[in-house]
Amino acid sequence: MTNVGDQGVDAVFGVIYPPQVALVSFGKPAQRVCAVDGAIHVMTTVLATLPADHGCSDDHRGALFFLSINELTRCAAVTG
């Protein structure tokens, strides 16, 4: 994992080197306009990227990972 958001970077696209199989990266949190259930909201979002070795995994696993992160952060925003 790499996090350059604290340095003001919006997004980073990491490069993996064998034997690495993936690298998740997070950019800086920012207020963005989002549509939720047909309504417009201003929400704090973070851009995340996940370069991966497709010989070891596939896009489906990456999508499941991001869905989990999305659910965890939504729950934290509601309860926090």
From Swiss-Prot:
Family matches, as Gene3D superfamilies: Chloramphenicol acetyltransferase-like domain
SUPFAM superfamilies to which the protein is assigned, alphabetical: CoA-dependent acyltransferases
Record-level Gene Ontology MF annotations: acyltransferase activity
Signal peptide bounds: none
Top-level taxon in the UniProt lineage: Bacteria
Alphabetical list of Pfam families matching this protein: 2-oxoacid_dh (PF00198)
Induction: A member of the dormancy regulon. Induced in response to reduced oxygen tension (hypoxia) and low levels of nitric oxide (NO).
Protein family according to the UniProt entry: Belongs to the 2-oxoacid dehydrogenase family.
Protein name from the UniProt record: Uncharacterized protein MT1774.1
Source species: Mycobacterium tuberculosis (strain CDC 1551 / Oshkosh)
